[in-house]
């Protein structure tokens, strides 16, 4: 190839690059301005908890104004805690929406990995026969912002705020073993069961509750005859409907409790701890219910330990 042909080819390459790149050196009117995105986490009391380590990982779906996915970003715990910005540049859309979900489990990440439209984005609990696995400490948030054009200079930095989407539950049942023994002999390995429900099993990407009703099985232990659950998480109920705690023995539902002895209902509060204390000893059933801050168990429930 002679020099003249090389020159012509070079000019054609530059012209094509200019047509598809959108940014011509003499005119930046079609150029999107680069910008940076950070994630900020809040608790239920609107305290900034970004640096506490509560957020272990974040997946951020980026949608254009039509709802079409144009990007998918991941951040780890260290990046979130350090408030590390993500450098971004999107050429084409007039606005973008960042839909961020923190602490999804591997199943949720796998289910959402290939979602191409915001209307198809769901965070569904794993469940078997209507019994759901307790979710992780989920956060989510949405930020919609315009894409700035007309310059290659740094654009406006953006922050997507994320908030908790689950409630915690802690259960103590005093005299549980004695109550079981009083209701018949142990004939089967699954002679006893405790279920708490119901809640929807699905969040949309925009944090709307939908889906099927599910229950949760607290994975507790019997200590000194009392049932004590670990702290576990649930999705909230629809329209602040109370949860029902059902106690089974030998395949039969023997107790169904949804309020404290004072009439306070078992309503899970997003970002808070629902404490349920049941005393099966004595002639009268005694039930206490309280709501405390995240990770704070009602200490009076341990007064007799």
From Swiss-Prot:
PROSITE patterns per record: PROKAR_LIPOPROTEIN
Keyword Lipoprotein listed: yes
Record's bilayer topology term: Lipid-anchor
UniProt entry tagged with the keyword Metal-binding: no
Lipidated positions per record (S-diacylglycerol cysteine): 23
Protein keywords: Cell outer membrane, Lipoprotein, Membrane, Palmitate, Signal
Domain of life: Bacteria
Main location: membrane
More info: The name (major fimbrium subunit) does not indicate the abundance of the protein, but is derived from the greater length of the major fimbriae. In strain ATCC 33277 and strain ATCC BAA-1703 / FDC 381, major fimbriae are 300 - 1600 nM in length and about 5 nm in diameter. In contrast, minor fimbriae are only about 80 - 120 nm long. This length difference is observed only in a small number of strains, including strain ATCC 33277 and strain ATCC BAA-1703 / FDC 381, and is due to a loss of function mutation in FimB, a protein that restricts fimbrial length in other strains.
Protein name in UniProt: Major fimbrium anchoring subunit FimB
Organism: Porphyromonas gingivalis (Bacteroides gingivalis)
Name of the gene: fimB
């Amino acid at each position: 190839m002679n020099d003249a042909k090389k020159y012509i080819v070079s000019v054609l390459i530059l012209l094509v690059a200019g047509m598809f790149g959108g940014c011509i050196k003499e005119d930046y009117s079609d150029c999107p301005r680069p910008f940076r995105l950070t994630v900020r986490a809040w608790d239920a009391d609107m305290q900034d908890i970004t640096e506490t380590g509560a957020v272990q990982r974040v997946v951020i779906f980026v949608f254009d104004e039509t709802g079409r996915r144009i990007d998918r970003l991941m951040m780890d715990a260290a990046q979130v805690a350090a408030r590390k910005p993500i450098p971004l540049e999107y050429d084409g859309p007039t606005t973008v929406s960042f839909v961020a979900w923190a602490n999804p489990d591997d199943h949720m990440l796998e289910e959402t990995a290939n979602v191409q439209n915001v209307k198809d984005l769901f965070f569904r609990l794993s469940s078997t026969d209507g019994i759901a696995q307790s979710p992780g400490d989920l956060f989510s948030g949405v930020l919609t912002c315009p894409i700035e054009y007309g310059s290659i200079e740094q654009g406006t930095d953006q922050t997507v705020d994320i908030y908790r989407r689950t409630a915690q539950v802690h259960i103590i049942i005093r005299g549980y073993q004695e109550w079981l023994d009083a209701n018949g002999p142990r004939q089967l390995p699954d002679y006893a069961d405790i279920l708490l429900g119901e809640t929807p099993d699905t969040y949309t990407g925009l944090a709307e509750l939908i889906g099927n009703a599910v229950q949760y099985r607290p994975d507790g232990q019997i200590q000194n005859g009392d049932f004590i659950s670990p702290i576990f998480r649930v999705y909230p109920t629809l329209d602040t409907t109370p949860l029902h705690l059902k106690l089974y023995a030998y395949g039969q539902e023997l107790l169904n409790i949804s309020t404290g002895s004072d009439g306070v209902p078992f309503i899970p509060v997003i970002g808070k701890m629902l404490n349920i204390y049941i005393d099966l000893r004595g002639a009268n059933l005694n039930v206490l219910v309280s709501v405390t801050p995240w990770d704070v168990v009602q200490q009076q429930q341990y007064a007799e330990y």
